Amino acid sequence: MKSVFQKITVMSLAAFGLTLLSSVPDVWADDEIPFSEAHIFFELNNTDGDLGIHALIDGDAWKKLEIEDPNERKILNVRVSGRLGRQGLTEFFFESAEPTFDELSPQRFFRRFPAGTYEIEGEALDGTELESEVQLSHVMPAPPQPYVNGLPMAQQCDEEDPGYDVTVTSVPVTISWDPVMTSHPDANGGGAGVQPPVAVAIHNYEVVLEIDVDVMGEEFTSKTSIILPPGGTEVTVPAEFLAQGEEFKYEVLAREANYNQTAVESCFVLE
């Protein structure tokens, strides 16, 4: 997701709460070794109206990596050569381009990446085959509806837009939202892949904040990210972060147990 404020891309183990290392067998029956981490998932920017496909893969050092969709069509083929090929790669993350719904409708997007079992195959430096199977779901969590100190999220953060409605508040600042319980309700948006909406299980929430500051005459973007368990629906912004200025942008992201994630963006100004 190319956020309007260049969101921190959080692919850390903390964000995903990964426990695959302890849940996968050491060696499969056919001597193929599974990747220690293997995830393919969707990310929806509900504010901008765009979808992208992401993957996070980690394991033994490899020189070749391929991904096949449920129809056995190859969607990724990476071969490492030269000195890097001799060194090998381990952790690998990608995110696709994310055209707006005007350019690529969500219906076409989900047809392009069907739900089902995706095979991730690789070749280790010593020639050993690596393989994992992952499930990709079209179930997207409904967008969070955040409040800043009890005030509904601003819908338009561009000062030049006639609908500019930035939230004006004072410290301390608490961002809260109701628990996300269902999948996306919009059949022409993030819910295009699954209708009617179904119940979801939230894996975690994430709040990202950003402010542009001037440091010795140069503009600098300060960011912070906070990850909460599924029962956490409230964050008090650290006073040290708020002390940097007055105009802040923020994002609240809901990550489902299938790792699909839906984010909304907004803003607030301190009095």
Enumerate the predicted regions with their spans.
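Conserved aromatic anchor
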Residues: 55, 166-199
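Proline/serine/threonine-rich low-complexity linkers at boundaries of modular beta-sandwich domains
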Residues: 132-153
